[in-house]
Amino acid sequence: MLSRTQEYALRAAVFLGRSHGDGPLRTSELAKRTGIPRNYLSKILHQMVRRGLVDSERGRRGGVALSRDPAEVMLREIIAPFQPAHEPKRCVLGRPECSDEFPCGAHQSWKKIKERTEAFFETTSIADVMAETPLP
């Protein structure tokens, strides 16, 4: 359901949430601690900075930090920048025609799953995830 980029963005955001208030964290350290390839992480963080989700500081004491309190940042905000502009709607059973008007056998169930998943990302904050996730 999530792309690798979205998974990495969530992983980085949760880790930054844990260190919120401790000052900036170097990208190399964040990459090492989260297991995300450094170059890939840099591109993800660049997008997060552009969206105002992460603050970036240059220099010896520089690094990245979550821009807001983890309780105020919903997971949807983290994954949205990495959502394809036009996500093709494919039938889970592979039918060429599948819609609300012409549904396949799994259409309604799959639609409910997607709606619940979207609601989860809309209403769950980084702090919520941190509370249930052990440290890496």
What is each of the regions a protein language model found here?
Residues R26-T27, A65-S67:
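Solvent-exposed interaction patches of small proteins and small membrane subunits
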Residues A13, L45-H46:
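Short, hydrophobic-biased segments on the C-terminal half of alpha helices
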Residues R51-L66:
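Beta-hairpin "wing" of winged helix-turn-helix
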Residues S67-P136:
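Non-DNA-binding regulatory cores of transcription-related proteins
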Residues N39:
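Key DNA-contact positions within bacterial/archaeal DNA-binding proteins
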Residues K32, V49-R50:
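Alpha-helical residues within the helix-turn-helix
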Residues L2-R4, Y8-I36, D55:
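N-terminal helix-turn-helix DNA-binding core of bacterial DNA-binding proteins
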